[in-house]
Amino acid sequence: MFSFTKNSIQKRQYFFTIATLVAFLWLSLAACTSAPSKKNEFKSPDEAAQALGTALKAGSNEELLAVLGPEAKELISSGDEVYDLQGRQNCLKAYDEQNRVEQDGDKFLLVIGKNDWPFPIPIVKKENGWAFDTASGKEEILNRRIGKNELDTIQTLLAIVDAQREYAMADRDGDSLLEYARKFISESGKKDGLYWTPQEGEEPSPIGELLANAQAEGYASDETLYDPWPYRGYYYRILTAQGNKAAGGPYDYIVDGKMIGGFAVVAYPAEQGNSGVMTFIVNHDGKVYQKDLGENTLELAKDMALYDPDDTWTPAQ
């Protein structure tokens, strides 16, 4: 797993270690980006499982689609290409650690890794042999993906709270004020965001680059504009004010250009219903709330200006 804060994420990782291993089972599908090929049928469930292992080791898109069938193309992306790649590598590692086929009623399951995790796509009897039933495994794969991403996002928001508190413990711009960061990525040569490129011998920034790049607006560095990409399926935005339903009532966190009154963050899925369902918010109090914003999640979350958890938001912890 990627380390994205200096200390806090190491303390939080144990909360979702098991969920991470589960995710490795389906993240291997993200390698399948080429045109679908004809689905293979095999003489036995064991042969089907061996074919999947061979395709994983080869790293071939065509071979994976040939084993899993064209339906697998719909399941190839979690919304985070970097994390998908890591997941594929760990899936292969788990397969190499241990793999076996077990019967479950009229179907067979491939079980991999030292913790005996079942691959979510069962092997079933077809007219001419045995094949992976990708269509029936779709719901399970999406449930695992969404559940994993949402658990990670809750912990990420708590880590951002820790990072903001750490940031505010020092005067970052020499104005003798302790303040929170208004953005994730600092301008070149400055420390006005939660992430900056550390110089040799310098203390690391409160968050790491991968999370910083998940800010929804993208960012500019050295006159180059970079598009945002999601962090484990989610985008993040810093909010600078709160509304009537927040504890303490409505007020701006920014006073005379300095964010000293508090902070808030919203995290929302990059692909609604695929990389996640719930949108999450948190402020300086450290309590995470969640809500399903529906099919217009991207637009609603991008337009969100206030931290304002009314009774349609429920605690996520």
For the regions a language model picked out, list residue spans one by one:
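Flexible, glycine-rich surface segments
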Residues: Y167-N274
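C-terminal soluble interaction/assembly domains
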Residues: G261-Q317
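Bacterial signal peptide processing site
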Residues: T33-A35
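C-terminal motif of bacterial Sec signal peptides marking the signal peptidase cleavage site
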Residues: S28-A31
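N-terminal secretory signal peptides that target proteins for export/translocation
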Residues: M1-F15
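Surface-exposed, charged secondary-structure patches
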Residues: A72-F119, L225, W229-R232, Q242-N244, ...
